[in-house]
Amino acid sequence: MNYSFTERKRVRKSFAKRVNNHQVPYLIATQLESYAKFLQADKPAMSRLTEGLQAAFTSAFPIVSNNGYARMEYVSYQLSQPPFDVKECQQRGYTYHSALRAKVRLIIYDREAPTKVKEVKESEVYMGEIPLMTENGSFVINGTERVIVSQLHRSPGVFFEHDKGKTHSSGKLLFSARIIPYRGSWLDFEFDPKDILYFRVDRRRKMPVTILLKAIGLNNEQILANFFNFDHFSLTANGGSMEFVPERLRGQLANFDVLDKNGVVVIQKDKRINAKHIRELEAAKTKTIAVPDDYLVGRVVARNIVDPDSGEILAYANDEITEELLATLRDAGIKQLETIYTNDLDSGAYISQTLRTDETADQMAARIAIYRMMRPGEPPTEDAVEALFQRLFYNEDTYDLSRVGRMKVNSRLNRPEMEGPMVLSNEDILDTIKSLVDLRNGKGEVDDIDHLGNRRVRCVGELAENQFRAGLSRVERAVKERLGQAETENLMPHDLINSKPISSAIREFFGSSQLSQFMDQTNPLSEITHKRRISALGPGGLTRERAGFEVRDVHPTHYGRVCPIETPEGPNIGLINSLALFARLNEHGFLETPYRKVSNSKVSDEVVYLSAIEEAKYVIAQANATIDKSGKLADELVSARQAGETIMVSPERIDFIDVAPSQIVSAAASLVPFLEHDDANRALMGANMSRQAVPCLRPDKPLVGTGLERIVAVDSGTVILATRGGIVDYVDANRIVIRVNDDETAAGEVGVDIYNLIKYTRSNQNTNINQRPIVQAGDRVVRGDVVADGASTDLGELALGQNMTVAFMPWNGYNFEDSILISEKVVAEDRYTSIHIEELSVVARDTKLGSEEITRDISNLAESQLSRLDESGIVYIGAEVEAGDVLVGKVTPKGETTLTPEEKLLRAIFGEKASDVKDTSLRVPSGMIGTVIDVQVFTREGIERDARAQAIIQEELQRYRLDLNDQLRIVEGDAFMRLEKLLIGKVANGGPQKLAKGTKIDKEYLASLDKYHWFDVRPADEEVATQVEAIKSSIEAKRKQFDEAFEEKRTKLTQGDDLQAGVTKMVKVYLAVKRRLQPGDKMAGRHGNKGVVSKIAPAEDMPFMADGRPVDIVLNPLGVPSRMNVGQILETHLGWAAQGIGKRIDEMVRQQVKQAELRKFLKQLYNETGRIEDIDNFTDEQITVLAENLRQGLPFATPVFDGATEAEIGRMLELAYPEEVATSLKMTPSRQQMILCDGRTGDQFERPVTVGVMHVLKLHHLVDDKMHARSTGPYSLVTQQPLGGKAQFGGQRFGEMEVWALEAYGASYVLQEMLTVKSDDVAGRTKVYENIVKGEHTIDAGMPESFNVLVKEIRSLGIDIDMERN
């Protein structure tokens, strides 16, 4: 096995039974690939595929002017380099974007000969700014990181459904069909309770479907021929004869005696015709059956019947036959007659009945009827009618089925080919109606809307493309109007195209769309989950109110595609989902999941991705099926799935097998160990709460994990990976310099990688992002190794919480109802201390009365308040501040006091500005204490920078220069090494220090020279001389390149900042706030076991073990049985074993046991069960490092659905606690419980207690952020009642029920106070305030404002109401 540099330092013992060769794919690949497809930035212009921007351009262009004399064509587009990098955009509040320029060609034709080209103009046109995706799949919009969530919407195509009997009181199923395009009008077909078929366009008024059939060019005869089989009759003088078709007679009631051709009665009247009768008729070789007139009456004529002599139409298609009609036909000598065949069972007369309700005569009349429905009130001219009908379904500009839609339509209508036109054809409409009629006749099944074959995912790229198209279509309309003037006014393409609509459409989408969300950045897991989220909400999707139970439910096709566990609780449940671990999108946007191929019950390594539609055809076994040594399925019957049903089949019938047991869950759920032992509801809470864990100051890897911790940490982008292999040259807290291996450097590029670490940076949720190096100078790393840890990661593994020793027992009521009792030792060790970074900003504006000024010179401020400010009036970095302290001094001009004429004159003479200023400094908000860690000053172009701003720029430049110098140092070092090798032993023609001609160059000589003088040595060999020259010029070129880069950086930093209108200067101050654990903070395990800290007890009061160690946390045992999350108990036991093994290794290291013994113990641990680790290949030094890292505990991986068994946990506990240790600790024989003692009395508790180690998280619901109190504050405008909520500095609502409580106590004065002076009696509350200030404590309650509001409300209804005063 290959271990990376960091993996080797601490190997996780895995209990996985199944070796999974299929790696978990890159977790944010869907986002990155989708946007890369949209931009196609790395492809040359001419070889771009028609998708994304390219598709939008090609669909909008060419644009032809209305008169046809000018035409604009699209050639290609290109994206420029972004002006600022991601970090600069975040600091300055810019959008990380690239400018889009399109090359466009304007062709003007000759008016005399319209085919002749008069002139062609080509130019590049600016098309707006396109935001770029960062390498981690997010966007920086106005300085904040955002994520575009993928949307799950109904796939375009044709769908058949019924109303489940809800519409009509009889419970009759009403069938309907709907053709949904990607863009354009929806076409619905539906039956009503009387079995008449209607259609509607875009949910408008319904009309009989035959109007549409006539509009597409069918007449009544053709309509009937398309939907019915015909019965053929020959008329005789009385009665007639019917062609004998056996299958149409079976099951009918004979209403006359049926005779065979010999005149023998085969079926008597009023008998039901059965198979025996049919056989008898066939045996008698019956071709026709004689029928009486009664049998013909009431049937429906299939074709127009024309009198052969006069040409008069005697009967129209769809007329019913009457006795009179039969007489007329006989008189006219008509011998043959065709009627439509219908019966009540499987061929109803629906279309025939619909045709009777339809009053339109021909195609034009039908189209006019459709026009009147779509455009009521407009006069239908022939051209307008024709144009509208074409635009509805047949025009590529207005109607687009898309490739997906065409594929879905063709497959649903059972056609062999999957390609076709992107607009509707008459066949599509006809086949859809036929299928719907078949459904009504009992043939076929309705579609399942929630099947993942009928719902597809729209990713970032597609959503952005749709917005771009919308913007482009607005541009197109404007260009079309102006193209006519292009020739007369000699305009260029860029004069015609205005890119504003495109920019605004894109900006609106990224800035304020429902799917563009503020990135959840609490910890790395929440980041990665947010990017893998799939929402059914948003434009073109569902709404919370309309979504029923079915849409939200878990569907069998979710298996391996969408996680059944991870979804929010509350109104969005089931509408927002997470992508499963291995799922990906196919070219059509449907979710696929991988399976390994099985042939003849042998499992191969070939992996096939199947979509939900394809999967239904196969029998698929689960990943935990038993496989023998030769790779064959071993059991006689294997549990498998087929079309969503679970079945037991023989191994030969299996087509595929799952790639991994964790295939069905998402990233967050797959991090929960023993997930298989938790109840679904609690598993959901566990997965959701992991995303709210606050990064701790000292991250601690979970002792019991699932093996995915490393994958999630690496894919989230929080850790730094080596982009190329090499040797670590230099490390400090801020940067890592790696000298790259020669074979990984391309010719002419710098063989050095510099990684600048992110230090104490604020995340979107105000948590702290900080990276720490985990390599040392001299370490050799390979590509992809972790070189620095980020927030919530420990040695490249995700570490969301801390490993706590827990005991399950009640403790004096302090863990009643999920409360948590915690030891003071945990707080003292800073285990759960987290740093939160607050950004506070202040702006100086130009006001009517003059400019605001940022200054230290503020009157009426004590020197103690100013002591932390520098001469520019900005706080120093490192200052410790608390609520009310000034961070940035600022003064604002105040309105002039009225001046006497004399003063005015003096002001006018001496030109003094307003002297009155008020103090509007930035102060620390209430309830906040912290340290200033960073200050940023932004100054508008043209305004002089203050000393502080210049100092910040200098510092930034110095840091940049340091990076360049490092690169140069390594480049020059390499060059001089090559030069030395080149020169030593060569003969010189001369050189510095009067080197004689013909002397051999040696090491001593070179050492005596300054390195830069080596180039002055003149080698005798011409070739060597050229090589020396080449090295010299390459160094000079690099120097020049670095100097240019430095100058570019300087220009960027010194140019003015782009601030809002009227703002001259902006200062941002960053405060680091340290939050220790305290009562009221919310904590949780990974199994949905959450609670609030009730008390932090002294360590000496906590229950302790026989060896004197107190436990860290005491949890209530009653929280487990009813919640059914037993996973936490198994985690506790396995964590206990992990800690015990760590103690044993620690003992071995301290006693300095022999390497062989240590190796033997490690092999016993790693290789008895589960995955085999390659311990033999470790060097002694690596074993020492490994053992050092295992002293805190041996980390376990128990993968989801493939984890440790009870026997394995038991075995690990035995290895951790040998007999003598277990006895000394008073453990039960299973080592899962022990006798504890009460910390306060020292007495033993009477029963053994479950003790172990659990990974516990501190959640982002901290009491500091929630604690709030109000004295006086803002009031609502209308009701004059206090506002609510901490953000508004609101009060606590005294509601209806609270009023009842006071009424019940008879506390009338308290009640009066609550409802008047403490709430909305405006005069009363002002008076009370004044009284309190004076020291009097009296109340004058008046009329509450809300009573006046009620009176006004009643008056507005026209009822005069007045107060009676007595």
UniProtKB/Swiss-Prot annotation:
- Broad class of enzyme this protein falls into: transferase
* Cellular component GO terms, alphabetical: DNA-directed RNA polymerase complex
**Any one of the GO BP annotations:** DNA-templated transcription
InterPro entries, per this entry?
DNA-dir_RNA_pol_bsu_ext_1_sf (IPR042107), DNA-dir_RNA_pol_bsu_external_1 (IPR019462), DNA-dir_RNA_pol_su2 (IPR015712), DNA-dir_RNAP_su2_dom (IPR007120), DNA-dir_RNAP_su2_hyb_sf (IPR037033), RNA_pol_bsu_bac (IPR010243), RNA_pol_bsu_CS (IPR007121), RNA_pol_bsu_protrusion (IPR007644)
Which reaction(s) are listed as its catalytic activity?
RNA(n) + a ribonucleoside 5'-triphosphate = RNA(n+1) + diphosphate
Q: Spell out the PROSITE patterns in the cross-references.
A: RNA_POL_BETA
Q: Which CDD domains match?
A: RNA_pol_B_RPB2
Keyword field contains NADP: no
In its keyword annotation, does this UniProt entry include Plastid?
no
- Record's keyword terms, sorted: DNA-directed RNA polymerase, Nucleotidyltransferase, Transcription, Transferase
> Which family, according to UniProt?
Belongs to the RNA polymerase beta chain family.
Give the protein's biological function: DNA-dependent RNA polymerase catalyzes the transcription of DNA into RNA using the four ribonucleoside triphosphates as substrates.
Q: Tell me what this protein is called.
A: DNA-directed RNA polymerase subunit beta
What would be the name of the gene that encodes this protein?
rpoB
